[in-house]
């Protein structure tokens, strides 16, 4: 139980670091954001998790991923929930339009591909304790419909 709490707190720290990076790189106008349609890779995020975790984390390179590039409903729901929680405690939004609730904002950020979170998919855990994972940016994934 303590390891799981530790990993959750580490992931929360990594998410906060990623949000800060994304907010610094956020472009206000949509015309400019279409011109700069590249994903900012931040290997330091992964390295921080590897160093802080009790398990060794092996990140599969982007060009060697084996899982689907479509978010599962669970992953999409989890992203919306985590982002809504951040927004509820005065997180800044990546949208110009005003919405009534943090959940609505989080859903729109996901559908507009502006959500500042990453998806980590565990592929397997080896007998020597290495955790093999893929890290996806939701901007490069298909998004399921959420009700």
Swiss-Prot record:
Molecular function terms, GO-annotated: DNA binding; DNA-directed RNA polymerase activity
Q: Where does the UniProt annotation locate this protein?
A: Host cytoplasm; Virion
Q: Which GO terms describe its cellular component?
A: DNA-directed RNA polymerase complex; host cell cytoplasm; virion component
Q: Which residues lie within the region annotated Disordered? A: 20-39
Give the family per the record.
Belongs to the archaeal RpoK/eukaryotic RPB6 RNA polymerase subunit family.
Query: What is its biological role?
Result: Component of the DNA-directed RNA polymerase (RNAP) that catalyzes the transcription in the cytoplasm of viral DNA into RNA using the four ribonucleoside triphosphates as substrates.
What is the name of this protein? DNA-directed RNA polymerase subunit 6 homolog
* Phylogenetic placement of the source organism: Viruses, Varidnaviria, Bamfordvirae, Nucleocytoviricota, Pokkesviricetes
């Amino acid at each position: 139980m303590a390891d799981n709490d530790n990993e959750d707190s580490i992931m929360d720290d990594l998410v906060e670091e990623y949000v800060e990076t994304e907010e610094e790189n956020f472009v206000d106008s949509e015309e400019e954001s279409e011109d700069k349609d590249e994903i900012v890779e931040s290997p330091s995020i992964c390295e921080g998790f590897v160093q802080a975790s009790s398990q060794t984390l092996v990140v599969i390179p982007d060009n060697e991923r084996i899982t689907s590039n479509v978010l599962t409903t669970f992953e999409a729901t989890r992203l919306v929930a985590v982002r809504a929680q951040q927004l509820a405690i005065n997180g800044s939004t990546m949208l110009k339009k005003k919405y009534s609730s943090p959940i609505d904002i989080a859903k729109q950020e996901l559908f507009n591909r502006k959500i500042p979170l990453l998806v980590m998919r565990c592929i397997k855990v080896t007998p020597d304790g290495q955790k093999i994972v893929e890290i996806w940016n939701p901007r490069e994934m298909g998004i399921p419909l959420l009700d």
